[in-house]
């Protein structure tokens, strides 16, 4: 029995799904294969992902492959209630709504696990972590899992290194056709979309501080610069900081950037990127946002401690009054691109979710053959998805001739 906010919203959700599907040709191609082959016949797939239109197309693809789908959200503010209702009408079991309390969030994760799933598809590893801590009775049944995001992979690799991981997990995040496009172009566009549509402020001429220069950070920096911002990067890794500098951005310590920033975007996957000492240095009217998976990159407890009052300044914007200045927090410090917008563009999620679908199939086909480790995506899978995407965009590539292949594998031929 599903539990969603309002089933009458389903027609709107179906429209969103149809729009997304039109722009996800690779996943649709895989759905056709799954419809014919039924690789998941008789299996239950438990999913915890941002429940919006693109995710729904992934779930529908797995449903076409014969799976029973039981799904919840992976963030209290990222579920779109109309899409959740539409998924129920599609025949999925859904436990999710926007604005869940922390208790409700974990209740819904447990509802997914109550279905006794065979395969897990996760974003942030909350579902997998819950299995390992509170629902250990499920470990023997689960064939494996797939993890979508950097934050989740960090957690899972730590578990694997300590010998705590009890079933194999495929690292979807590090697929070339995921992180080079989803993390960079997806996060860049959708984070700026969330900031702009929520604040209705001009970006041009403002100092935009980006915390972190991984693929997500460089995507945000690129798009902010495209809007005319003065982009400032903060980093802890000198190699990435050097890249940012040579890409033309200012690189500062956060304590210096805090003094001059107008808009802040954290993209690190780590906690306390913005904290008390930074809030004290910020100017009146500073806007804070987070594009990392969890809401701990901006220390909200520190911000509350410094504030005389907190109120809603506008939908999805909280005003923290520190007495001598006001600081504005977007989307409760949760993922700004999903809490304040519609998430990544359909075209990049087409590749990310194609990887999820094929990785779930990989787990099924290799049941009992995999160790309890974090596995990288096979190169052949990356290659297939990239080629399908290229063709869908009207592009094509050359092939090496036999002579070229021989040359590249022969150490004898030189100048």
Swiss-Prot record:
Keywords of the record: Cytoplasm, Hydrolase, NAD, One-carbon metabolism
Chain positions recorded as substrate binding sites: 123, 148, 178, 182
Residues binding NAD(+): 149-151, 183, 212-217, 235, 291-293, 337
EC number(s) stated in the UniProt entry for this protein: 3.13.1.9
Enzyme class: hydrolase
Record's keyword annotation contains NAD: yes
GO molecular function terms noted in the UniProt entry: adenosylhomocysteinase activity; trialkylsulfonium hydrolase activity
Pathway: Amino-acid biosynthesis; S-adenosyl-L-methionine biosynthesis
Principal subcellular localization: cytoplasm
Gene Ontology CC: one annotated term: cytosol
Cofactor (UniProt): NAD(+)
InterPro entries per record: Adenosylhomocyst_ase-like_sf (IPR042172), Adenosylhomocysteinase-like (IPR000043), Ado_hCys_hydrolase_NAD-bd (IPR015878), NAD(P)-bd_dom_sf (IPR036291), S-Ado-L-homoCys_hydrolase_CS (IPR020082)
Compartment(s): Cytoplasm
CDD domains, A to Z: SAHH (cd00401)
Transmembrane segments: none
Comment on bound cofactor: Binds 1 NAD(+) per subunit.
Catalysed reactions, semicolon-separated: S-inosyl-L-homocysteine + H2O = L-homocysteine + inosine
UniProt GO BP: one-carbon metabolic process; S-adenosylmethionine biosynthetic process; S-adenosylmethionine cycle
A Pfam match: AdoHcyase
Assigned protein family: Belongs to the adenosylhomocysteinase family.
Function recorded in the entry: Catalyzes the hydrolysis of S-inosyl-L-homocysteine (SIH) to L-homocysteine (Hcy) and inosine. Likely functions in a S-adenosyl-L-methionine (SAM) recycling pathway from S-adenosyl-L-homocysteine (SAH) produced from SAM-dependent methylation reactions. Can also catalyze the reverse reaction in vitro, i.e. the synthesis of SIH from Hcy and inosine.
Miscellaneous field: SAH is a product of SAM methyltransferases and is known to be a feedback inhibitor of these enzymes. As a result of this inhibition, organisms have evolved efficient enzymes to metabolize SAH via different pathways. The pathway found in methanogens differs from the canonical pathway, it uses the deamination of S-adenosyl-L-homocysteine to form S-inosyl-L-homocysteine for the regeneration of SAM from S-adenosyl-L-homocysteine.
Name of this protein: S-inosyl-L-homocysteine hydrolase
Species of origin: Methanococcus maripaludis (strain DSM 14266 / JCM 13030 / NBRC 101832 / S2 / LL)
């Amino acid at each position: 029995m599903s539990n969603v906010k309002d089933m009458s919203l389903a027609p709107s959700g179906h429209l969103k799904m149809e729009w997304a599907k039109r722009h996800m040709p690779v996943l649709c191609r895989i759905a056709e294969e799954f419809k014919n082959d039924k690789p998941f016949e008789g299996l239950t797939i438990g999913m915890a992902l941002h429940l919006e239109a693109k995710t729904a197309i992934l779930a529908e693809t797995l449903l076409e492959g014969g799976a029973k789908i039981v799904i919840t959200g992976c963030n209290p503010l990222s579920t779109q209630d109309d899409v959740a209702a539409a998924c129920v009408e599609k025949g999925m079991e859904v436990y999710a709504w926007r604005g869940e309390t922390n208790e409700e969030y974990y209740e819904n994760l447990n509802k997914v696990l109550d279905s006794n799933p065979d395969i897990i598809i996760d974003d942030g590893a909350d579902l997998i972590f819950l299995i390992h801590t509170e629902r250990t009775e499920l470990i023997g049944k689960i064939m494996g899992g797939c993890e979508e995001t950097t934050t989740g992979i960090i957690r899972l690799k730590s578990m694997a290194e300590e010998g705590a991981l009890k079933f194999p997990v495929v690292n979807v995040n590090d697929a070339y056709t995921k992180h080079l496009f989803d993390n960079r172009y997806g996060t860049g566009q959708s984070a700026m979309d969330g900031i702009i549509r929520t604040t209705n402020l001009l970006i041009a001429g403002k100092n935009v501080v980006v915390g972190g220069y991984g693929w997500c950070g460089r995507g945000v920096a690129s798009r902010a610069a495209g809007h005319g911002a003065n982009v400032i990067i903060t980093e802890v890794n000198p190699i990435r900081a050097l890249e940012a500098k040579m890409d033309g951005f200012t690189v500062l310590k956060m304590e210096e950037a805090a003094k001059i920033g107008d808009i802040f975007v954290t993209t690190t996957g780590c906690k306390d990127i913005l904290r008390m000492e930074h809030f004290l240095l910020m100017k009146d009217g500073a806007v804070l946002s987070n594009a990392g998976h969890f809401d701990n990159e901006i220390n909200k407890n520190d911000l509350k401690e410094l504030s005389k009052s907190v109120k809603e300044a506008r939908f999805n914007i909280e005003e923290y009054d520190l007495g001598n200045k006001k600081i504005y927090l977007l989307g409760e410090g949760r993922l700004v691109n999903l809490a304040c917008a519609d998430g990544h563009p359909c075209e990049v999620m087409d590749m990310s979710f194609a990887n999820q679908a094929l990785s779930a199939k990989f787990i099924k086909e290799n049941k009992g053959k995999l160790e309890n480790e974090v596995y990288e995506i096979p190169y052949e899978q990356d290659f297939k998805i990239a080629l399908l995407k290229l063709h869908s965009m009207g592009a094509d590539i050359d092939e090496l001739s036999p002579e070229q292949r021989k040359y590249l594998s022969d150490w004898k031929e030189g100048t």
